[in-house]
């Protein structure tokens, strides 16, 4: 697998969960002998939803809810077969979305 690169994108609503997951991935990859670039924090996506408080009138009375999606990027340079195997076995929390590109 010489000359290849694995790119991992992590997404989560909680920044503490995503940071601990990124730390776990970096530790696992460095233990197997591959080099790591990252975790790189990507821009946080913020969705704001505006809802009228009352069920049928009083349009001036509104409530705002926001949902933040935190993102991280990790590049693994020159991965070994042992690196790929350890990444497949890695157990991460349920609140983290993982995209792996070879």
UniProtKB/Swiss-Prot annotation:
The gene is rpsJ. Involved in the binding of tRNA to the ribosomes. It comes from the Bacteria. InterPro entries: Ribosomal_uS10 (IPR001848), Ribosomal_uS10_CS (IPR018268), Ribosomal_uS10_dom (IPR027486), Ribosomal_uS10_dom_sf (IPR036838). One of its GO terms (cellular component) is ribonucleoprotein complex. Part of the 30S ribosomal subunit. GO terms for molecular function: structural constituent of ribosome; tRNA binding. The keyword Methyltransferase does not apply. Pfam families: Ribosomal_S10. This is Small ribosomal subunit protein uS10. GO terms for biological process: translation. SMART domains: Ribosomal_S10. The keyword Ribonucleoprotein applies. Keywords: Ribonucleoprotein, Ribosomal protein. NCBIfam families: PRK00596.1, rpsJ_bact. Belongs to the universal ribosomal protein uS10 family.
């Amino acid at each position: 697998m010489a000359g290849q690169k694995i790119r991992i994108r992590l997404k989560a609503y909680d920044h503490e969960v995503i940071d601990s997951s990124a730390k776990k991935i970096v530790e696992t990859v460095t233990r197997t002998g591959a080099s790591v670039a990252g975790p790189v924090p990507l821009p946080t996506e913020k969705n704001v939803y505006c809802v009228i408080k009352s069920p049928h009138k009083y349009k001036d009375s509104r409530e705002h809810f926001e949902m933040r999606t935190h993102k991280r990027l990790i590049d693994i340079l020159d991965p070994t077969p042992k690196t790929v195997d350890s990444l497949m076995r890695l157990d991460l929390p349920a609140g983290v979305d993982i995209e792996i590109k070879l």
